[in-house]
Design a protein with these regions (language model features):
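Active-site-proximal C-terminal subdomain of hydrolase catalytic domains
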Residues: 67, 75-171
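A short acidic, often aromatic-flanked loop/helix-cap motif at beta-alpha or helix-coil junctions
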Residues: 1-5, 120-123
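Caspase-like (clan CD) cysteine peptidase catalytic core
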Residues: 2-29, 33-95, 156-158
């Protein structure tokens, strides 16, 4: 599955089929892990369903690989949403959320990642309607609750601003 995931990223998203004005949204729900490198730095991974724990290095996908793929895409906006334990190691903080900032930011290229938990956090699997708490709240946000300024658009910044406190309130 690792190879299929990476092939889909490279063959369908990081090639000429994705144009400079496109927007890409990628959602992953599954397992994640953190490994400490020899340097002492932690590295986050997503773990495909068919991964063998004995073959972690070749079966898991490092968050740095995902960041590199996102940077290689021509698309104007790329957002990865990760519902996995320890996925926060792929996270970079966003900036201010004023509406003028958001309008200006929409004109620029952006790479964003929203994660279910921090670098050292496990996340709850059991939530409403058979989803994890994170995914359930994410679906509510995408259905409209995440449009915090009421302009009819849900930005990555608005999504994060809605999801984080809503997940905390539910879990």
């Amino acid at each position: 599955t690792r190879n299929n995931i990476l092939a889909a990223f490279h063959d369908r998203l990081a090639d000429d089929r994705t144009g400079k004005n496109d927007r890409v949204f990628v959602f992953f729900a599954g397992h994640g892990a953190t490994r400490q490198l020899a340097s002492g730095r932690d590295l986050g991974y997503i773990i495909p369903v068919d991964s063998d724990p004995k073959e972690f290095a070749t079966d898991a996908i490092a968050m740095t690989d995902i960041q590199n793929i996102a940077e290689s895409m021509q698309a104007k906006h790329v957002m990865f949403v990760m519902d996995a334990c320890y996925s926060g190691l792929g996270l970079t903080r966003g900036g201010p959320s004023s509406s003028s900032f958001l309008r200006e930011n929409a004109r620029r290229s952006a790479r964003q990642m929203l994660t279910a938990g921090g670098a050292d956090q496990q996340v709850a699997d059991a939530g409403p309607n058979g989803h994890s708490v994170f995914t359930w709240v994410l679906l509510q946000a995408l259905a409209g609750k995440g449009d915090l300024n009421g302009d009819g658009l849900i930005t990555g910044t608005e999504l994060a601003a809605y999801v984080a406190p809503a997940v905390s309130a539910v879990s």
